Amino acid sequence: MTRSSVLADALNAINNAEKTGKRQVLIRPSSKVIIKFLQVMQKHGYIGEFEYIDDHRSGKIVVQLNGRLNKCGVISPRFNVKIGDIEKWTANLLPARQFGYVILTTSAGIMDHEEARRKHVSGKILGFVY
């Protein structure tokens, strides 16, 4: 089986572990995009601590789960999102207003849609978490 997306596989593993009630999950392979995505999730309290383990290959990440996550996923292909269109994407992807985050990759780094609106930057849509 070929991997379609490393980020999609990682978020799928987190979703499955959260649904089965696990306290932690091992993600491999690792990438910088996964680490930044996890940092945004951690900042908003959807996951606990996570630790990067360098195994001199592609690396592993051990994520501590805290039971707050309902769902996270990847948007593929990574559509370009203008600042004015962010509101439409949040309405389409998230279950309610003021609930969950759409995560974008911008020229200023990977961030959630609220931070992107504050910094007045647009970019490509990576995924969502709620």
Swiss-Prot record:
Keywords tagged on the record: Cytoplasm, Ribonucleoprotein, Ribosomal protein
Cellular component GO terms, alphabetical: cytosol; cytosolic small ribosomal subunit
GO biological process, one term: cytoplasmic translation
One GO MF term: structural constituent of ribosome
Superkingdom per UniProt: Eukaryota
Subcellular location, principal: cytoplasm
Cellular compartment(s): Cytoplasm
PROSITE patterns per record: RIBOSOMAL_S8
Further information: Present with 40400 molecules/cell in log phase SD medium. There are 2 genes for uS8 in yeast.
HAMAP family noted in UniProt: Ribosomal_uS8_A (MF_01302_A)
Purpose: Component of the ribosome, a large ribonucleoprotein complex responsible for the synthesis of proteins in the cell. The small ribosomal subunit (SSU) binds messenger RNAs (mRNAs) and translates the encoded message by selecting cognate aminoacyl-transfer RNA (tRNA) molecules. The large subunit (LSU) contains the ribosomal catalytic site termed the peptidyl transferase center (PTC), which catalyzes the formation of peptide bonds, thereby polymerizing the amino acids delivered by tRNAs into a polypeptide chain.
Family: Belongs to the universal ribosomal protein uS8 family.
Record's protein name: Small ribosomal subunit protein uS8A
